[in-house]
Design a protein with these regions (language model features):
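Active-site gating loops and adjacent loop-to-helix segments of metal-dependent hydrolytic enzymes
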Residues: 43-76, 113-132
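Divalent metal-binding segments
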Residues: 2, 24, 28, 51-99, ...
Length: 166
């Protein structure tokens, strides 16, 4: 949180450090933001690589997701992804995947800042059976995290090819 914008001399006088660390061979950067993630899919890394998108999705990813999708799967994949992101300097993500309630709880528990997408898709999943259920459950997740300091929510239609015009 930015608390003041001051000339250097005034800043040093007003906010005198308790300790100074000299790292002449280092650089201090703000945390990076990964603006497009499907973090639980870290557990699917390497599945049918190097295929065109639609065959990859329809013949490989969606069938595997249908077989393994569960709250525990989402939490485990999210935890792994957060560990990997933190190791690389990423401190915030914009997420879009199933079980946003589990994802939000995972990010909160790990102290990781996230915008959790509330998915909309035209086919059933382990999280919701219909567009109306995706919407209703998404609103509930949104309401549960409305004032959370780390986790916020966004509506996240998946893609033009997985949602109707309605």
């Amino acid at each position: 949180r930015i608390v003041a914008l001051l000339p250097r001399g005034q800043a040093h006088a007003r906010f005198a450090p308790k300790q100074t660390v000299s790292r002449p061979e280092s650089i201090l950067l703000p945390g990076l933001v990964n603006a497009h993630t499907h973090n639980p899919m870290t557990l699917l890394r390497g599945v049918a690589d190097d295929l065109p998108l639609m065959p990859w999705l329809t013949e490989h990813i969606w069938p595997v997701e249908a077989a393994v999708m569960s709250p525990a799967y989402i939490a485990d994949g999210g935890e792994l992804a957060v560990a990997e992101m933190l190791r690389g300097g990423t401190t915030c993500c914009n997420e879009n995947y199933f079980f946003p309630d589990v994802q939000a709880a995972t990010y909160r528990r790990m102290g990781f800042r996230a915008v959790v997408g509330l998915p909309f898709i035209e086919f059933p999943s382990a999280w919701a059976a219909s567009p109306a259920e995706y919407f209703d459950k998404g609103l509930e997740v949104h309401d549960n995290y409305r004032r959370d300091p780390l986790v916020s929510c966004s509506f996240a239609p998946h893609a033009p090819y997985t949602v109707s015009d309605e």
